[in-house]
UniProtKB/Swiss-Prot annotation:
Subunit-level organization: Homodimer.
Gene this chain is encoded by: proS
One of the record's GO molecular function terms: proline-tRNA ligase activity
EC code(s) of this entry: 6.1.1.15
Domain of life according to the entry: Bacteria
Broad class of the protein's primary localization: cytoplasm
Originating species: Shigella dysenteriae serotype 1 (strain Sd197)
Biological processes per GO annotation: prolyl-tRNA aminoacylation
The protein's name: Proline--tRNA ligase
Lineage, uppermost ranks: Bacteria, Pseudomonadati, Pseudomonadota, Gammaproteobacteria, Enterobacterales
Length: 572
């Protein structure tokens, strides 16, 4: 490709509305342009990267035995009504009617469509297992699209769905998809972790996220410093302290705390160690409970894990925090004065709270706290559960090492769905025993456009993008200095361009009438891994300057050796 016949579209300045580095660099490198909120046009450089990602995904899915299909973006509403997700999905599901007033949706995912297809196409267990995938545009009407293509409304996704007659068969395919995803992200040169995850609104029994580690990530990824343990923070277990609870050394005292309505204020005003405080959060109880609310207690420096809390049998789903009005109606005190002593509703405490002694908490009286509280002396030990987020330094749940926490960008997610959708849509086949058998399903997604942004978040410097070789838009840039004035530079540039292309190498020849500084800046901005610079001064010595983008190292290579050298660098 020649720049004179290409839409390079680089920008010198960073657009003001671009928050994260990937969004900034994708705009500056001429990869994308914003059409409307959460909607982007992909320009040639962006498409080249996108296709590289797509091809790796497609190759590994095919290698894993998955079969490619293509399903409509527009889906009839009756399928979503049949599955029960028409009401559940919320405003992210874009709904519309056609000219015949028939309701449809723009597909954010395709569980319903693929299950409908399979219930009409398959009839016997002999046809299974099967795993279908597509790489296709999806639409989710995000309330606040942000971070460029990281959280856009329209995006490209690889979604796959497998069908089975047994849990054992599903587990085999799930393991194969786990391995395929690991190969996909390894081939792309990404630093990632596969982590245990919550199944969320998709449903099902088991789930793993594939997280690219990056400071701009929206998720907290937890992993052991010693073992292979890794989990999303929502699912990471906070194990109980091994040490027994210390004996009481203080009497429980009622203290006036009129200006301490938060843990931070309590700690500051009374010089308390934060690890000797407990905060109390009230949430709505499950429907049909004899109590309207449930009290959840965590240590003052810890955060409630809402996913864990929602799974408590006495807690309503979705988890809903009580309003001040609801709290006062039950406890007769405000949110800043709550605690376990004389709490008139069920109480669940975190494992580490159960191991505390001589701690401070609200007295359930406005402007008052109890100091020196001890379990079983001042208040009976209530139900104990793991309801907090882990923190860095906690022991790993597998007993090996301690936990580290880094930010991550979710680029892939695999689920064991079980029979959630097949039961709702009555997808079944004749089993080996001749009886009708509901199918067991798995689903497996990769955010293809998000992978591009995540790769940039992990691979950039002050000059621009530093692409991993496997997904770079071009492999080699040829920069001929003053080629329009120097015949030998022009002749050599054309010769190398032809020879490299003949070797199957993707080359960008910068044949613009531009200053050298502009040419260098553009090639570094778009992140081409290998650059060769042709100039009269070096050619006097039969040399060509070679530069590797990732480490910035330069070296002189003889003209006759440069093609062989580049082929070796790229193809190994």
């Amino acid at each position: 490709m020649r720049t004179s016949q290409y839409l390079l579209s680089t920008l010198k300045e960073t657009p003001a509305d671009a928050e994260v580095i990937s969004h900034q660099l994708m705009l500056r490198a001429g990869m994308i342009r914003k059409l409307a909120s959460g909607l982007y046009t992909w320009l040639p450089t962006g498409v080249r990267v996108l296709k590289k990602v797509e091809n790796i995904v497609r190759e590994e899915m095919n290698n894993a035995g998955a079969i490619e299909v293509s399903m409509p973006v527009v889906q009839p509403a009756d399928l979503w009504q049949e599955s029960g997700r028409w009401e559940q999905y919320g405003p992210e599901l874009l709904r519309f009617v056609d000219r015949g007033e028939r309701p449809f949706v723009l597909g954010p995912t395709h569980e319903e469509v693929i299950t409908d297809l399979i219930r009409n196409e398959l009839s016997s267990y002999k046809q299974l297992p099967l795993n279908f995938y597509q790489i296709q545009t999806k639409f989710r009407d995000e309330v606040r699209p942000r971070f460029g293509v990281m959280r856009s409304r329209e995006f490209l996704m690889k979604d796959a769905y497998s069908f089975h007659t047994s849990q054992e068969s599903l587990q085999e395919t799930y393991d194969a998809m786990y391995a395929a995803y690991s190969k996909i992200f390894s081939r792309m040169g990404l630093d990632f972790r596969a982590v245990q995850a919550d199944t969320g609104s998709i449903g099902g029994s088991a789930s793993h996220e594939f997280q690219v580690l990056a400071q701009s990530g929206e998720d907290d990824v937890v992993f052991s410093d010693t073992s292979d343990y890794a989990a999303n923070i929502e699912l990471a277990e906070a194990i109980a302290p091994k040490e027994p609870r210390a004996a009481a050394t203080q009497e429980m005292t009622l203290v006036d705390t009129p200006n301490a309505k938060t843990i931070a204020e309590l700690v500051e005003q009374f010089n308390l160690p934060i690890k000797k405080t407990v905060k109390t959060l009230l949430v709505k109880a499950v429907e049909g409970s004899s109590f309207p609310l449930v009290a959840l207690l965590v240590r003052g420096d810890h955060e409630l894990n809402e996913v864990k809390a929602e799974k408590l049998p006495q807690v309503a789903s979705p988890l809903t925090f009580a309003t001040e009005e609801e709290i006062r109606a039950v406890v007769k005190a405000g949110p800043g004065s709550l605690g376990p002593v004389n709490m008139p509703i069920p109480v669940v405490i975190d494992r580490i709270v159960a191991a505390m002694s001589d701690f401070a908490a609200g007295a359930n009286i406005d402007g008052k706290h109890y100091f020196g509280i001890n379990w079983d002396r001042d208040v009976a030990t209530p139900e104990v559960a793991d309801i907090r987020n882990v923190v860095a330094g906690d022991p790993s749940p597998d007993g090996q090492g301690t936990l580290l926490i880094k930010r991550g960008i979710e680029v892939g997610h695999i689920f064991q769905l079980g029979t959630k959708y097949s039961e709702a849509l009555k997808a079944s086949v004749q089993g080996e025993d001749g009886r009708n058998q509901i199918l067991t399903m798995g689903c497996y997604g990769i955010g293809v456009t998000r992978v591009v942004a995540a790769a940039i978040e992990q691979n950039y410097d002050e000059r621009g993008i530093v692409w991993p070789d496997a997904i770079a838009p071009f492999q080699v840039a040829i920069l001929p200095m003053n080629m329009h004035k120097s015949f030998r530079v022009q002749e050599l540039a054309e010769k190398l361009y032809s020879e490299l292309r003949a070797q199957g190498i993707e080359v960008l020849l910068d044949d613009r009438k531009e200053r050298p500084g502009v040419m260098f800046a553009d090639m570094e901005l778009i992140g081409i891994p290998h650059t060769i610079v042709l100039g009269d001064r070096n050619l006097d010595n039969d040399d060509i300057e070679y530069k590797y983008r990732r480490n910035g190292e330069k070296q002189l290579i003889k003209t006759g050796d440069i093609v062989e050298y580049l082929v070796k660098q790229i193809k190994g």
